[in-house]
UniProtKB/Swiss-Prot annotation:
PANTHER family: HOLLIDAY JUNCTION BRANCH MIGRATION COMPLEX SUBUNIT RUVB, PTHR42848
Top-level lineage group: Bacteria
Keyword Oxidoreductase annotated: no
Family label: Belongs to the RuvB family.
Enzyme class: hydrolase
EC identifiers of the protein: 3.6.4.-
Stretches for region Head domain (RuvB-H): 265-365
Keywords carried by this UniProt record: ATP-binding, Cytoplasm, DNA damage, DNA recombination, DNA repair, DNA-binding, Hydrolase, Nucleotide-binding
Annotated protein name in UniProt: Holliday junction branch migration complex subunit RuvB
GO terms for biological process, alphabetical: DNA recombination; DNA repair
Domain remarks: Has 3 domains, the large (RuvB-L) and small ATPase (RuvB-S) domains and the C-terminal head (RuvB-H) domain. The head domain binds DNA, while the ATPase domains jointly bind ATP, ADP or are empty depending on the state of the subunit in the translocation cycle. During a single DNA translocation step the structure of each domain remains the same, but their relative positions change.
Coiled-coil regions listed in the entry: none
Length: 365
């Protein structure tokens, strides 16, 4: 079956800044409900099972849990599962939303014993709120300051025992005192294609998509090791199958749909290729700082650093060195260009010859 990925396609229809009605419900329906339902991350699941079961046997709240890793790997889903496994209520917030200590105090005062408090992007929490969180995590109390100047008084406020689950894409950006107060840290890794294929087949069943096995494997290979991307591509391929085919997602349909959405066989999208192109064509392969690279592609540095780089580094196309980002020979080859003689063949060679900065180290410019 042949498809023209260009005919009758409106480029402007690819991007929408608004959340389409029902997308939130779809996302919720695809989330696993228990550790047994969770596909992938076997080491993290085993560790969490021990932490949670031990706490239930003791009749106490588990230690505070920090989950780190790139976006889209299931940190929020895991927080929901933790609350479900404990039979507790889940309270959700994010680091940027906690600008003042009073914001955090109000949330903590409403917790009941055993609740799970989930703070997404915890590395972005404001310093006053973070300092209040220290005492709440250790002693389950906070000191609320009333008044100003010499007449100010500190009123102790008891907090019900709770479990804090923090999620971060940049564990290196957490302060030492905050990081040390977590009793368990789970490092989420990218998924294998076989695991993503299982996730896709499960999601297809929930969404009512007729997904053939080889088509699921093809989508999984292009999903950058990330379940969120895999499920997003599945929905877009479903749209293509319903509009331009007979609704069945075959290998041909999947490949044609992914071509429409500019996802190549490695899973690189338009932004990834723009980053590689700027690094190679504009800066001769580097080294170049992330801020300069972000300006060249018209994106925020955080977008390049947190969305593009994790996969490009893992794919061996970009190396993070103390002097900046460097394109490997694989990046030149991906762009159809001949790499210079001194270009590293891949991430391993670069790490041997020059130490790389940590992937999520904010100082790795």
């Amino acid at each position: 079956m042949n498809f023209d990925p260009i005919d009758d396609f409106d480029d402007e229809s690819q991007v929408s800044a608004e959340l389409v009605a029902g997308d939130g419900d779809v996302e919720a329906s695809l989330r696993p409900k228990s550790l047994d339902d969770f596909i992938g991350q076997p080491r993290v699941r085993e560790q969490l099972q021990l932490v949670l079961t031990g706490a239930k046997l003791r009749g106490s709240t588990p230690d505070h849990i920090l989950m780190s890793g790139p976006p889209g790997l299931g940190k929020t889903s895991m927080a929901m599962i933790i609350a479900g496994e404990l039979g507790s209520s889940l309270r959700l917030t994010s680091g940027p939303a906690l600008e003042r200590a009073g914001d955090l105090a109000a949330m903590l005062s409403n917790l009941v014993e055993g609740d799970v408090l989930f703070i997404d992007e915890i590395h972005r929490i404001a310093r006053p709120a973070e300092e209040m969180l220290y005492l709440a995590m250790e002693d389950f109390r906070v000191d609320v300051v009333v008044g100003k100047g010499p007449g100010a008084t500190s009123i102790p406020l008891e907090v019900a025992p709770f479990t804090l689950v923090g999620a971060t894409t940049r564990s290196g950006a957490l302060t030492g005192p905050l990081r040390d107060r977590f009793g368990f840290t789970a490092h989420m890794d990218f998924y294998e294609p076989e695991e993503l294929q299982q996730i896709l087949m499960r999601s297809a069943g929930i969404l009512g998509v007729n997904l053939e096995v080889d088509a699921g494997a093809e989508i999984a290979r292009r999903s950058r090791g990330t379940p969120r991307i895999a499920n997003r591509l599945l929905r877009r391929v479903r749209d293509f199958a319903e509009v331009r085919a007979d609704g069945i997602v075959t290998m041909d349909v999947a490949q044609a749909a992914l071509a429409v959405y500019d996802v190549d066989q490695l899973g690189l999208d338009r932004l990834d290729r723009s980053v590689l192109s700027a690094l190679v064509r504009s800066f001769g392969g580097g080294p170049v700082g992330v801020s300069t690279l972000a300006v060249a592609v018209g994106e925020e540095p955080s977008t390049v650093e947190e969305v593009c780089e994790p996969f490009l580094v893992r794919a061996g196309m970009i190396a993070r060195t103390p002097r900046g980002r460097v394109a490997t020979a694989a990046a030149w080859t991906q762009l159809g260009m001949t790499p210079p003689p001194d270009a590293a063949a891949g991430g391993i060679e670069v790490r041997v010859n020059e130490p790389q900065a940590t992937l999520f180290d904010p100082n790795g410019e």
